[in-house]
Amino acid sequence: MLDEALLPDGSFHPDWEPWSQVSQEEGSETIHTWEKVVRRLEREMGLTHFQDSTATSLNSPWSVDSVPWILGSDDWALIEKGLEQRVRLMKAIQQDLEGACRLLSERVLPPEIVFLHRGYLPQLHGLEPSPTLNAFDLARGPDGKMWVISHRHDITSGLGFALKNRSILSRALSTPFQRCRVRRLADFFRSWRDTLESCSSRTPRNCRVVFLSSEQRRVKAEDFFLANYLGYTLALPGDLTVRDRQVWLRSLGGLQRVDVLWRTVIGRDLDPLEIAPQPCDEWGLPALFSAIRANQVQVVNPPGSGVLESPAFVPFYRAICQKLLEEDLLLPSAATWWCGEPKALDHVLSNLSTLVIKSAVSRWDNRRQYGAKLSAGELSTLRQQILADPAAYVGQEEVHLSTTPSYRGGALHPAPSGLRTFAHSDLFGNVHVMPGGLGSVISSDGERERECTKDVWVRAEGPLPPHHSLWPSASDESAKTTTSF
């Protein structure tokens, strides 16, 4: 495994040296002290999604590790450029699928990949371009480059936890944070807020943005944290109504018109009048799609963008990038085979015990299976499932994650780690990449479950510009003066 922090001779990577120097200067108990401060701040913020009511320490998948993931400016510049291209590519694909359909008519992309995916919503084709907020899961490949493992375009999660992690570690580790000259996150959120408020025909001052959450969303505290940080109203579908193809927010003062909905409700579940909900669904705003088609409300991300999450796109990205952007793909993806093609199907079935099998029709289907963990009987069952519906499956190379230092049991240990990054586009096609992200420490026992999260520090190449917090409330002076988002 590649080590993000240590060189082959055991010394720290130059990008990690300021963090290492501070830990040595302040004594052997420094990291343990940081750990105690991190746990205290985490309890005070109250955002951690614990798996049970008795969890009090680093045993929740959303707890933050007291050791950050540090990336140098040169390393990040390559990642940033690749992510910027990925966002442009995803927008170009969606515009093509909703317009000229060159990818399908010229057989660059097999039509089954699009039409079988549950995120494909032809009800909303022909709309004006909309801004998007995207997430990309990355892992360090054996060539030392970051590889893209998966995309998130329908709804994204983790942005609030990345913000929480930065709030905690910038305070608990204030000295190494300053020594490392860590790039701030506030400018990214500021540009995202400006983008949302520019979506309305009304002036930004009069534009009403509502953060649409869900009753069943597992980490709803994250939605509350983000809405509070950006100064938006957090609402559930039942708090809204559609009248005369306009969306309104119910309030004690009467109905208030909504211009922009930033959603964390799955696209297929947004409007039960147009797409029949599943029996367990409790969300949805009837007639929302009619308001969208009438250009009376902007919904971000646009419903229908979920189709872009299909891993079946991956084998065709290089050809698609050349066709639509006339560029070479900058960030590689994990090798992937769509079973809807006979040769790819043969390869997957011949290597079933070494591949990761995923659903090609919905990321919400619980079909991800690691062949290396399955028994002979389970592999046989999986083989029959794939043969029964090949187009619904992909096989993907299992990427062995690089390691970062993680504080466990009173000591530092190398832990497999993955990285989720975020980027957004505005109405003018400009792409903004968040200089940081949400790191995940993955269990090394073969279960590949998240053990905790990490703050991701991207080091600045030169002096940092003045920092201005985005906290909207003057009453939260402590957050304004002590956090370094």
Describe the role of every protein-language-model region.
Residues M1-F485:
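Preference for protein termini
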